[in-house]
């Protein structure tokens, strides 16, 4: 998942906890207002691939699977139950009774089949269609040779069977991401090109209106299949609100959530104010900020040079630059991700050892370029890295550019080094596989890809494939152990210098209630609107 980071924007926060437990009894009724600086681009679940779009999409639509509120624990959603064949090549879902689209029509298995075919169809231009590449018939549909997936069968209105071409341990997670959310064909076709602005789903909230540049309004779905929720009657998302102005409005009681997060310039002040103690929710993110090194170009085709860069960078100082809103990273995986190796401390900050490695590398004087996004604090972070590299004898010129230009250079394989801030990867779902293939595997080391280091270790790719073929419950711990070993070996090859793992902070009004985990929910980002409530509801 590509997201803006290091500007307190929302992201996936992983909470290995029990489902949310409320300090006060939830109440039915009331409303909430959330502000964002920028307008949304689409509410089409098969197309939206941005945290801000997701924040609304996830309350309008549902998938076959979801996660328990405030956690990363999978559970059936539109599916009532599921079974998996012994070979891991067949998944059978029984659909929940009584599920209706917001237009009043009952959802059936035909809607499930249509929704996945729509995601894969190249005409939809879904950025997530490729996630379903293991479903039989994918190549034909994605290649424009067919419009139906042969691997999805609907024996009756309440049963959906997925036939896979290979076992994939991440498949149930894929049933919970927005690209697989269920949509009604007749509404998609009726809206045509405007479907992304006239959404109809099965979710907790119904779409009311979208005034571009101003607001989006939702109302409670009284026929929602989860009894008792949502609690709020109405939600309004206001756009064009600078986060610093939004903070002032929140203090005046005019809004309820600063959607873009705590502004960096006000972070220390807000966190130090005791009055905000119960109004700031803090959570981890499935995020790592890193420096890529293009391993196909000198001098970074030399392992010792890459290891020296890892040892040269003072991560603690960089964390202080962003007001301690992160923790130093030791490896590619963030601490909250399954497969993270707490025993692996990574490369310690050691400039003298870095100098020794550079001498052993025999590359002579090194002059290179460090690309970085030109939005604060990324230029300051890049300057800190530049100073550290200079101290060990590496001269790095900073190329401070717009996000699109940095992404273009990385995808073209032209950038020797890239600081990922503002473009870093946040997992689409809580599994180590999602932190590998696109950004460290051979599949991403192509023109237009997100593996900007161009690191391609075919042995590790094969091991990753073997790990993901382990789909049985009693193989889970073995699989995660294999992924842990894969990422340990990635660290040895040092295509990245992991810098930090950012945390998420959500600032909300005192009138909103709900467990703190709901305000940094790992899936319904930035907040799980389906389960928070208004304390002053009448």
Q: What feature does the model see in each segment?
A:
Residues 169, 211, 312-342, 376-386, ...:
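Detector for C-terminal structural segments
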Residues 80-128, 161, 249, 299:
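Aromatic- and charge-enriched surface segment that lines or borders ligand/interaction sites
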Residues 68-69, 146-149, 163-230, 234, ...:
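Gly/Pro-rich hinge or "lid" segments in bacterial periplasmic/extracellular proteins
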Residues 94, 113, 124-185:
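Surface-exposed binding/hinge segments that line
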């Amino acid at each position: 998942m590509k997201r803006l980071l290091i500007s307190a924007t929302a992201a996936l926060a992983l909470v290995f906890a029990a489902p949310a437990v409320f300090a006060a009894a939830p109440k039915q009724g009331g409303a909430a207002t959330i502000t964002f600086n920028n307008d949304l681009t689409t509410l089409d679940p098969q197309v939206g691939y941005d945290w801000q779009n997701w924040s609304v999409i996830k309350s309008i639509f549902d998938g076959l699977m979801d996660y328990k509120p405030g956690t990363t624990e999978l559970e059936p959603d539109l599916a009532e139950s599921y079974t998996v064949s012994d070979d891991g090549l067949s998944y059978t879902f029984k659909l929940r009774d009584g599920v209706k689209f917001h237009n009043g029509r009952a959802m059936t298995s035909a809607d499930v089949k249509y929704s996945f075919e729509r995601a894969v169809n190249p005409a939809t231009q879904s950025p997530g269609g490729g996630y379903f590449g293991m479903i039989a018939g994918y190549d034909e549909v994605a290649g424009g040779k067919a419009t139906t997936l042969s691997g999805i069968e609907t024996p009756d209105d309440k049963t959906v069977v997925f036939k896979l071409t290979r076992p994939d341990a991440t498949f149930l997670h894929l049933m919970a991401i927005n690209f697989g959310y269920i949509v009604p064909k007749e509404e998609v076709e009726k809206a045509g090109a405007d479907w992304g602005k006239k959404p109809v789903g099965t979710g907790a909230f119904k779409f009311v209106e979208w005034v571009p540049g101003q607001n989006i309004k939702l109302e409670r779905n009284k026929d929602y299949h989860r009894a008792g929720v949502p609690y709020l009657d109405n939600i309004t998302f206001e756009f064009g609100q600078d986060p610093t102005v939004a903070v002032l409005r929140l203090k005046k009681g005019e809004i309820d959530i600063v959607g873009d997060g705590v502004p960096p310039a006000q972070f220390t002040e807000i966190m130090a104010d005791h009055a905000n103690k119960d109004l700031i929710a803090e959570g981890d993110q499935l995020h790592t900020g890193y420096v890529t090194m293009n391993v196909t170009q000198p001098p970074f085709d030399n392992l010792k040079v890459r290891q020296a860069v890892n040892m040269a960078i003072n991560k603690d100082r960089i964390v202080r630059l962003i007001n301690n809103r992160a923790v130093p990273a030791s490896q590619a995986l963030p601490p909250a991700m399954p497969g993270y190796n707490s025993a692996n401390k990574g490369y310690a900050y050691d400039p003298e050892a870095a100098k020794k490695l550079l001498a052993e590398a025999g590359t002579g004087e090194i002059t290179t370029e460090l690309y970085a996004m030109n939005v604060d604090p990324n230029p300051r972070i890049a300057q800190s890295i530049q100073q550290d590299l200079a101290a060990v004898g590496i001269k790095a010129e900073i190329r401070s550019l717009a996000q699109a230009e940095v992404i273009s250079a990385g995808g073209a394989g032209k950038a020797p080094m890239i600081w990922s801030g503002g473009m870093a990867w946040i997992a689409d779902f809580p599994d180590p596989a999602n932190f590998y293939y696109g950004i460290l595997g051979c599949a991403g080391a192509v023109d237009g890809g997100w593996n900007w280091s161009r690191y391609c270790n075919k042995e590790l790719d094969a091991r990753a494939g073997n790990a993901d073929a382990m789909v049985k419950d009693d193989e889970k711990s073995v699989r995660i152990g294999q992924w842990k070993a894969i990422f340990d070996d990635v660290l040895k090859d040092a295509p990245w210098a992991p810098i930090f793992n950012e945390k998420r902070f959500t600032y909300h009004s005192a009138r909103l209630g709900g467990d703190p985990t709901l305000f940094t929910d790992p899936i319904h980002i930035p907040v799980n609107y389906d389960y928070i409530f208004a304390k002053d509801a009448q």
